[in-house]
Design a protein with these regions (language model features):
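Transmembrane helix-loop-helix hairpins at the membrane interface
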Residues: 2-166
Length: 167
């Protein structure tokens, strides 16, 4: 169980945040914060191979990118990514191994606890002086980024990968 947790929760959170918010976002930063946030988020969404998961991953990627821009670190996003993966892991584990009543109770607790905990964290961070604002820097036209050969190559690769391995 521990090895599954490492493989399905910890490693993806660390590796994906290093790649998307660390490397890709860092490479895109000279083009401005908007490109640095949205371009890796789109790739992050495509990586998840499924339309529903991809859209959710894109939105989460935008938030994690914004958080990395505002905080100057990928560690908060890495922690949130780990929490998200852990919640999904626990939900799947409980649905498979726990009685329905117990599974439902734990899922309901997690569904209520983590958003409330997140709101408390935001309130606490604001009390410590952390301000949440867009903070986007001007840069090159975002269209230039999305039509660049390197970006197009990665998008084509992820789409082909999704078509081959999903079907």
């Amino acid at each position: 169980l521990f090895m599954y947790y490492l493989a399905l929760c910890v490693m993806p959170a660390v590796a994906e945040e290093l790649l998307f918010r660390g490397a890709f976002q860092g490479l895109m930063r000279p083009s401005g914060s908007a490109a640095a946030i949205f371009a890796p988020a789109l790739l992050f969404g495509l990586l998840h191979l499924d339309l529903a998961q991809g859209l959710t991953a894109f939105v989460c990627g935008v938030f994690l990118g914004w958080l990395a821009e505002r905080s100057g670190s990928i560690l908060p996003g890495m922690l949130l990514h780990l929490v998200n993966n852990t919640l999904a892991f626990l939900t799947m584990y409980l649905r498979y191994y726990a009685p329905t009543e117990a599974s439902f109770g734990v899922e309901l607790f997690l569904l209520l606890f983590f958003p409330l905990f997140g709101l408390w964290m935001i309130w606490h961070a604001r009390g410590q002086g952390f301000r949440f604002s867009a903070g986007l820097r001007p840069g090159v036209d975002v269209l230039t980024v999305f039509t660049s050969p390197a970006y197009s190559a990665v998008v084509v690769f992820l789409v082909v990968y999704a078509v081959i391995f999903v079907h």
